[in-house]
């Protein structure tokens, strides 16, 4: 379960300038059994604080800049030994350019860098800080004012301590 709310500190549609802060609270409601290898839940709370800035560079081109930090609660029932899992904050910086072909349709490209998030098990550092840089190109279309369809292709440019995605295709429907 993810609870989210945004506070708009700047909301100026006439100049296409926006600045908002969003808080995401991840509630541990999935099933979790420390003896299972795979669990749907993490048995811990998470909180992400995200700041996003959008500005129109021209009448058809927008720049989106987003930064966020995720804080993790601890899981004190990790594995059969009931170890304690703790995690350092995880940071992400994103930048996107969007070109509005029409008011309903845009083309977009972006870059993202995620870093941090080292874990500790029973206070022993796991030396697993993440550092991932990825690129995305895509398109979005408002089929009607309440329905947006998004398609993005992406690839990881560099990965430290994780799996590298050569190709990724994402489809989103927002209503």
Enumerate the predicted regions with their spans:
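Outer membrane beta-barrel transmembrane domains
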Residues: 77, 82-175
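Hydrophobic, aromatic-enriched interface-forming segments
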Residues: 41-78
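Transmembrane beta-strands of outer-membrane beta-barrel pores
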Residues: 9, 25-31, 55, 69-73, ...
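Residues on the lipid-exposed face of transmembrane beta-strands in outer-membrane beta-barrel proteins
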Residues: 3-9, 23, 49-55, 69, ...
